[in-house]
Amino acid sequence: MAVIVRRPGPPLSGLVTAIVYRAGEQPQTSVEKILPSPETGLWVNLNRDEFRSFDQAGASRGVAGAMLAGPTSRACLIEFEQGHAHVSVTFALGAASRFAGPSLPEARDELVPLETLWGRSGACLRERLLEAATPADALEVMETVLLRQLTGTLALDPAVAAAARALSRGAGVGEVSRDLGLLPRTLRRRFTAQVGLTPKRFARVQRLQRLVRDLDGHARADWAAMAARHGYADQPHLADEFRDLAGVTPGEYLRSRVNGPNHLRPGGAGPAGAACG
């Protein structure tokens, strides 16, 4: 297994969390359910020019091997190849709009080919990475491409950043709107444009993320206590939210985790998850 991480300098340092090369950590090809996340990422498959996702019925959908994975509002099913090698970019929350532009809200729950966003530069990116002499060189190429795609016309919105921090801590959307002096519809418009999710959906996804991080490493849970700790009305409310966002019951989640808190073996009762894209 090989993992190389590059932390870009200014002006990307506040926009890109990391550029990462990974290879050889997948022992066999498998399909995994991925929990919803507000993060937006860029992925380039170095094994083949394709990524694959699956719907509830098992039908697969392919997308080009260089793509933007938008924020997700529900669980999705993705194939991970044996010996998978890829380059990925993790954007700081709200920063992907500087690279995806006004297309970011349309990328929600989608895998978007980079050619669609960047034209020829996106279409040729995978080939350029494969031509790099070393993985470290490939990461340098990726940083250079990001610099060229960076647009200065979409400044990060301080109100959106403040709202995201408050919502991530568990504040309500109405409370955040009042504290920022914004009408709810104004906050919704500005927040969705830069994050890709509405404030309400973002808050629900972040609450689920706080919950699963709290559960990480535990085989059992006191669900009533977890509901109270993470802002659910009661245990049934927690269970309903879990099924709606993750497609499994809380108990099924504990039994099906693989590779960290956000990856599950497909199956279980309830919606099986939707295809990303």
Question: Residue ranges of each PLM-predicted region?
Answer:
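Alpha-helical bundle regulatory/interaction domains
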Residues: 1-184, 194-199, 213-218, 222-233, ...
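Hydrophobic alpha-helical segments, especially transmembrane helices
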Residues: 186-189, 205
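DNA major-groove recognition helix of helix-turn-helix
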Residues: 191, 203, 241-243, 254
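A glycine-rich, hydrophobic loop/mini-helix early in the fold
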Residues: 246
